Swiss-Prot record:
PROSITE patterns reported in the protein's UniProt record: PGLYCERATE_KINASE
GO cellular component terms listed in the entry, alphabetical order: cytosol
InterPro entries: Phosphoglycerate_kinase (IPR001576), Phosphoglycerate_kinase_CS (IPR015911), Phosphoglycerate_kinase_N (IPR015824), Phosphoglycerate_kinase_sf (IPR036043)
Name of the featured protein: Phosphoglycerate kinase
Family (UniProt): Belongs to the phosphoglycerate kinase family.
Transferase found in the keyword field: yes
EC number: 2.7.2.3
Description of how the protein assembles with itself and partners: Monomer.
Chain positions recorded as substrate binding sites: D21, F22, N23, R36, H59, L60, G61, R62, R118, R151
Keywords: ATP-binding, Cytoplasm, Glycolysis, Kinase, Nucleotide-binding, Transferase
Domain of life assignment: Bacteria
Binding site for ATP: K201, G293, E324, G353, G354, D355, S356
Organism, as annotated: Fervidobacterium nodosum (strain ATCC 35602 / DSM 5306 / Rt17-B1)
Amino acid sequence: MEKLTIRDVDLKGKRVIMRVDFNVPIKDGVVTDDTRIVEALPTIKYVLEQGAKVILLTHLGRPKGGPDPKYTVKPAAERLAQLLGKEVKFVPALYGEEVEKAVAELKEGEVLMLENTRFDPGEEKNDLELAKKWASLADIHVNDAFGTAHRAHSSNVGIAQYIPSVAGFLMEKEIKFLSKATHNPDKPYVVVLGGAKVSDKIGVITNLLNKADKIIIGGAMMFTFWRALGKQTGNSLVEEDKIDLAKQLLEQAKEKGVELVIPTDAVCAQKMEAGVEKKVFTCEEGIPEGWAGYDIGPASIELIKSKLADAKTIVWNGPLGVFEIEDFANGTKAVAEFIASLTDKGVTTVVGGGDSAAAVSQFGLEKKFSHVSTGGGASLEFLEGKELPGIASIADKKKQ
């Protein structure tokens, strides 16, 4: 890893301002899923053990350009205190006298959390005045928020113009696994792409046609490919304006010798809800009017397993069906379990964040993959081969 991390700097007695990703679901003032807080614990604990004073910054939700009590990060501070087993001081502000006083009183090994970074509209504009205010509170910046790495905001990118920025453990792990998967994967390298829209994945498919040995398509975007193959898709979700593009991608894959695997059957229903009548239609026969596909069918599951069997590196981004409804979760679950079983055989298995990470945890498989990314949009842009601003802003290691 070519970036400086918290291991590379002296933290004793330093004021450390740390950008974490505590964008967690909250109901009635209580955190309902603390996964993201738990994932930041190793970084926070390490920095505290080194004798630093820690100031935490995070966003939560999408407040409309100003403070909104619904999006306060106070419940996240309370949950963190329980997990750490120590007090987490909370100031309901982002800068100003109250914040400066709290920072001045902070002792080594203590934690202070500031309010939701997005309560200041400058955050998402990468306002440098705002970044300067935060930088003035600390000696060093720790970036452990991979989930926002594809965004240039004041709290992760702007601040690095004024004080040195280093990676936390979570950020380091994300970069390590995703870099390996995108830059020098052990081959055969197989990518599984699901989700509803081809348009969301065009950049990824185009970039991976130069890197992957096989690309497996699933989720509703498979129907745009079925249409490109001249097949009927009934009432399934199809991006009409992307059918020609799907044809081009099929052609490009052929030219580059990359196997683009399209599911051969689908589990269909007349309504997207649990307990309705379901039928399996094949790509060849097509899906009749009034029916729509909501999952890959049994033949597709076997086809996909056979294409994954010899892989040495697997990256999976996007569910293969509407996994939130049990009737249509079978394809995603079967493929997730199969990929998980390959991890034990020494295959590097990486799950992109977002819906695929949610699916993996719904099936209780999150410990069974080499790496489950914490960033949906960020992992997608990483796979597109883009440089992410929130990684570029972290200081580079000096070449020895």
